Design a protein with these regions (language model features):
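Conserved N-terminal catalytic/coupling substructures associated with nucleotide/phosphate chemistry
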Residues: 1-108
């Protein structure tokens, strides 16, 4: 299944993946969407080495780094595809648009 405007694939969760940005895009989109961690851009399943740990990190990042609160608008689960573990993030369209990434640090 190829990527679409409602499906996004990420090979892995690493420093280069701004998962908050992806979630915010779906929160602000009128239909929401699904993000898969552990599937590459061509749709091939790759194993997530610590799927449970990644799922917890993702939940924490969404909860703490997005405003207004996205609680109740997303679900993060570990699934098995082709014998490998992946992380599936289902995001509903938010009702308090626009959603944005919180900034941290001192302000002027």
């Amino acid at each position: 299944m190829p990527e679409t405007n409602r499906i996004e694939y990420k090979r892995e969760l690493n420093i280069d993946v701004d998962i908050e940005k992806e979630v915010i895009a779906f929160l602000n989109y009128h239909e929401g969407g699904v993000i898969y961690i552990g599937i590459d851009k061509t749709g091939n399943v790759v194993d997530v080495s610590d799927a449970d740990g990644d799922a917890l990190k993702i939940k924490d990042r969404i909860k703490n780094n997005i405003s207004p609160s996205a609680m109740g608008l997303f679900d993060v689960v570990v699934e098995e595809r082709k014998g490998k573990e992946i992380v599936k993030i289902t995001v509903a369209s938010g009702s308090e648009k626009p959603y944005f990434k919180k900034k941290y640090g001192m302000t002027d």
